[in-house]
A protein has these predicted regions:
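C-terminal binding/interaction regions
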Residues: 1-22, 80-147
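Structured beta-strand/loop patches that form or line metal/cofactor-binding pockets in enzymes
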Residues: 21-55, 59-60
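Functionally engaged cysteine thiol sites
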Residues: 38, 63, 133
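Active-site phosphate/pyrophosphate-handling residues
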Residues: 42, 71, 132
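Short, thiol/selenol-centered motifs that function as redox-active sites or metal-ligating centers
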Residues: 60-67
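Alpha-helical macromolecular-interaction surfaces
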Residues: 67-68, 87
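Alpha-helical support elements that line or immediately flank enzyme active sites
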Residues: 69-81
């Protein structure tokens, strides 16, 4: 299976079987966002213990890219501190901003492990209009953490 096909399967899996879907009983932080260009919607809730995200829930509707990205993001941030999430967010945004077809190599000692499933979204950067779809959840996350 080619890498691009594998990435497509990862995206479709997260779209069809979104992780952390629903609501939290008593979220410590929440935010929502809409991509006005295509109508994607994300509502995110976080439970925090100190500086660490201990639970996360997401609801939304929209294209497969926005919903899969939000699902992957919730998996990636669970158990992480704000500082770790800021670092992860910066790496995700870097990946989405790169030009060309080259693979992102954020950590040569751990290829494919820095962003995990999120690396499946690398191909989106070839379609600039879709970058906002993939980034919506991350924008909502930043808003929630800024509360």
């Amino acid at each position: 299976m080619a890498l691009e096909e594998l990435y497509r399967e990862v995206i479709l899996d997260h779209y069809r079987n979104p992780r952390n879907r629903g609501h939290l009983d008593a979220p410590d932080a929440s935010a929502e966002g809409v991509n006005p260009l295509c109508g994607d919607e994300i509502h995110l809730e976080l439970a925090l213990e100190g500086d660490k995200v201990v639970a996360v829930a997401v609801e939304g509707q929209g294209c497969s890219i926005s919903q899969a990205s939000a699902s992957m993001m919730t998996e990636a941030i669970k158990g992480k501190t704000r500082a770790e999430i800021e670092d992860l967010t910066a790496k995700f945004r870097l990946m989405m901003s790169l030009d060309g077809d080259g693979d992102l190599d954020l950590d040569p000692d751990r290829p494919g492990q820095v962003l995990g499933d999120l690396e499946a979204l690398q191909g989106v950067r070839k379609y600039p209009v879709r970058i906002k779809c993939a980034s919506l959840g991350w924008t909502v996350l930043a808003d929630a953490l800024a509360e």
